[in-house]
C-alpha cells in the first residue's frame, strides 16, 4: 500500500497540472481572439464614423503634410476612406507606404511613370496599397463566401479595364444577413453600401488588426 499511494498521488498531481495548463492555454487563445476582434471592430467603427462626413469625390492631386497628411476634409477618393479609417486607430498609411516604397521602389507598380516616391500621392493609389498589404503579409483568401470577409478587412475590386477600387468591410450586415456591408467612396462620397460582390474582387487584406 505504501508503494501504491505515491504513484496515485503523482498521477493525480500530473492530471491536475495538465488540466491547469489546458485552462491557461484556452484562456490565452481566447484572449488573443478577443484582442483581434476588438481591433477589427475599432477599424470598422472608424470607417462607419466617416460616413457621417460630407465628402465630395475629388481625384485631384494635393500637396499634403507628412506624416499624417490628408487631403481637404470635404474631399477624397476611395483610398482616402481607408487612409482616414486607419489613421483613427493610430496607423498612418501615408508614412508606412512611403517608408516601404522608399526601401524597395522597384517592387511597386510603374503605372504612373514615376522614378521615385511621392509622399503626396503614393498611398492614395489602389495598386500601391495592394502591393503594400501583400508585402506586409496581410493578404487573405479571395472567395465568393460572405462569411470570409470580416469587419475591418480591406477589399479591392476591378471595376473594368484598369480601374481599381478599394473599401472597408464593416460590422453591419446586408438585409439577407449573408455578408457584411462596405464603407467606400466610388463617387458619391463616403457611404455604407451592400456591394461586396458587385464588382470583381482582386484583393482581400487584413492589416494591422
Over which residues does each language-model region extend?
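Second-shell loop/turn segments in exported
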Residues: 36, 64-73, 115-119, 140-144, ...
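Low-complexity, Gly/Ser/Thr/Pro-rich intrinsically disordered linker/tail segments
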Residues: 179-209
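Sec-dependent signal peptide recognition
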Residues: 18-24
Amino acid at each position: 500500500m505504501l508503494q501504491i499511494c505515491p504513484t496515485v498521488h503523482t498521477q493525480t498531481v500530473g492530471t491536475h497540472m495538465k488540466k491547469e495548463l489546458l485552462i491557461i492555454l484556452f484562456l490565452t487563445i481566447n484572449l488573443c481572439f478577443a484582442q483581434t476582434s476588438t481591433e477589427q471592430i475599432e477599424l470598422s467603427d472608424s470607417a462607419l464614423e466617416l460616413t457621417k462626413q460630407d465628402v465630395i469625390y475629388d481625384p485631384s492631386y494635393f500637396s499634403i503634410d507628412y506624416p499624417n497628411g490628408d487631403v481637404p476634409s470635404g474631399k477624397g477618393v476611395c483610398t482616402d476612406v481607408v487612409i482616414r479609417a486607419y489613421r483613427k486607430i493610430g496607423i498612418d498609411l501615408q508614412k508606412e507606404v512611403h517608408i516601404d516604397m522608399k526601401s524597395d521602389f522597384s517592387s511597386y507598380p510603374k503605372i504612373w511613370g514615376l522614378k521615385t516616391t511621392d509622399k503626396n500621392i503614393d498611398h492614395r493609389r489602389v495598386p500601391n496599397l495592394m502591393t503594400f498589404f501583400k508585402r506586409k503579409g496581410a493578404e487573405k483568401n479571395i472567395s465568393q463566401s460572405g462569411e470570409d470577409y470580416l469587419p475591418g478587412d480591406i477589399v479591392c475590386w476591378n471595376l473594368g479595364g484598369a480601374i481599381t477600387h478599394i473599401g472597408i468591410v464593416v460590422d453591419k450586415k446586408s438585409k439577407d444577413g449573408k455578408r457584411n456591408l462596405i464603407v467606400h467612396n466610388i463617387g458619391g462620397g463616403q457611404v455604407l453600401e451592400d456591394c461586396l460582390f458587385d464588382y470583381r474582387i482582386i484583393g482581400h487584406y487584413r492589416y494591422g488588426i
